[in-house]
Amino acid sequence: MSKQIVHGDQCRKKIIEGINVVANAVGITLGPKGRCVAIEQSYGPPKITKDGVSVAKAIQLKDKSLNVGAQFVISVASKTADVAGDGTTTATVIADAAVRELNKAEVAGIDIQEVRKGAEKAVEAVIADVRKNSSPVKNEEEIAQVATVSSNGDREIGEKIANAMKQVGQEGVITVEDSKNFNFEVEVVKGMRFDRGYISQYFATNREKMITEFENPYILLLDQKVSTVQPLVPVLEAVAHTGKPLVLIADDVDGEALTALILNNLKGSIKVVAVKAPGFGDRKKEMLEDIAILTNGEVITEQLGIKLEKVNDTSKLGTANRVIVTKDHTTIVHDKNNSDIEKKVNSRCEQIREAIKDTTSDYEKEKLQERLAKLRNGVAVLKVGGATEVEQKERKDRVEDALHATRAAVEEGIVPGGGVALFYASRVLDSLKFDNEDQRVGINIIKKVLEAPVRQIVKNAGGKEDVVVNELSKSTDKNRGFDARTMQYVDMIKAGIVDPTKVVRTALQDAFSVASLVIATSAMITDHEEDNNTGNRSGGGVGGGHHGGMGGMDF
């Protein structure tokens, strides 16, 4: 395929135009009066959302040069979502403003490398000031405030998340799922989460969120590494006949075995996800046994005379109501009404408590306490309902955003919301030292860019940006901000309008990182447009027209 190359000013112009297209679509969602975006789906009704990263990821521009710019800012939103779980719209708005201002300096003939150095110093100083003015989350009400703001002012969502955290602890496991009715409920069930994710991203069932979600799966627990597929065949065929998915937790899965599982998963012969077992050595064996008790299964281990190739039915497999696997974590949710499992879990907890009493090692005691907490605290499930499927999905998105923001707040604290944390932090730049005038230009660019979130929130609320910015510039109270919901100036902390420090910090860092890359780019290589309209137009099917029944599994 032939390529086209664009250089210099024309290159940056196209990239900036692409960034601006995405930023305009994402920016309208910011703040309490931000608007929703309707995203066409390949099937079913459109997705209605105010989630910045969902909007960004849905954008694919026809013009390939513009699309390069779009992908730059989509990467900002994605990275911020991965690290902080929220703040994607703020990051996008800042990145757009930073790229435009840095480009003006470049066009004016200023040494862009020195400008970048000055801007980098400014970003570091602002982040230090934001951290300095951060306050820890002290109580349930503050957790509710963070969740309320992040869910677009939905107080019910804020209170439900605060209630869930109260029941399972601030570091407890909370999941979000669809309710079977109109209601929004919190339910605490038996379950656990451990710090191991899927072995390959090809196991992800939700490509947008890159997670695997299984309802009522079987769980195969192996105290061994699996490299060849043959020992797995009997149990895989037994599970395939039931039509249920399989979660395979083992020391490791690689080679032929991993390839076969991925192939059959993609083919649809069996829904499966492979996960590495948590822990190491003897602790790994104990944690596998914990999972076995929770799921009413058995650990397949040759130490007990159980060989994998002899497992040809589902009798030794565990079960769960739901399993969610990300690249980093696995969460198992079980039915709290199963009295047999309840008794076994309570007995196991008692064994762990006795072990805690007997150990003299602080490290061992800490690890035992972690295991006890995983078994004892359970999982809080936020069940989100709605009058229609579209309404339910939109609300579920807001609940997930609010949950991410709340976790970020617990981790690093909170700052005044509404964009004022960055706005007031920019004042430290007035006394920031610089090596030359070009660096001062970079510092001033960041100072101007930090107005962008406030301006976007005011704009979305139908207010006058310059008037609000001018009013806040006079304020000596760093908590004073503009409440876009009431169109009044208020003490943001007292009004409960707060942002997680981690979200604010990450948004600025990621936005500047991408803006720096864009401004350092002087050439762009893309496919020729006409090449996309050529190619094989034959009507033949893929793979030689194989049409079997289910076709069995590929081993």
Curated annotation (Swiss-Prot):
Region Disordered, residue ranges: 528-555
Record-listed E.C. numbers: 5.6.1.7
GO biological process: protein refolding
Catalysed reaction equations from the record: ATP + H2O + a folded polypeptide = ADP + phosphate + an unfolded polypeptide
GO (cellular component) term, any one: cytoplasm
Residue numbers binding ATP: 29-32, 50, 86-90, 418, 499
Signal peptide stretch: none
Keyword annotations from UniProtKB, A to Z: ATP-binding, Chaperone, Cytoplasm, Isomerase, Nucleotide-binding
Keyword match Nucleotide-binding: yes
GO MF, one example: unfolded protein binding
Protein's cellular compartments: Cytoplasm
Pfam families associated with the record: Cpn60_TCP1 (PF00118)
Feature: compositional bias, Gly residues: 537-555
SUPFAM superfamilies, A to Z: GroEL apical domain-like (SSF52029), GroEL equatorial domain-like (SSF48592), GroEL-intermediate domain like (SSF54849)
Subunit text: Forms a cylinder of 14 subunits composed of two heptameric rings stacked back-to-back. Interacts with the co-chaperonin GroES.
Task performed by this protein: Together with its co-chaperonin GroES, plays an essential role in assisting protein folding. The GroEL-GroES system forms a nano-cage that allows encapsulation of the non-native substrate proteins and provides a physical environment optimized to promote and accelerate protein folding.
Entries under HAMAP family matching the protein: CH60
Family: Belongs to the chaperonin (HSP60) family.
UniProt xrefs under PANTHER family: 60 KDA HEAT SHOCK PROTEIN, MITOCHONDRIAL
Protein name: Chaperonin GroEL
Organism: Orientia tsutsugamushi (Rickettsia tsutsugamushi)
Lineage of producing organism: Bacteria, Pseudomonadati, Pseudomonadota, Alphaproteobacteria, Rickettsiales
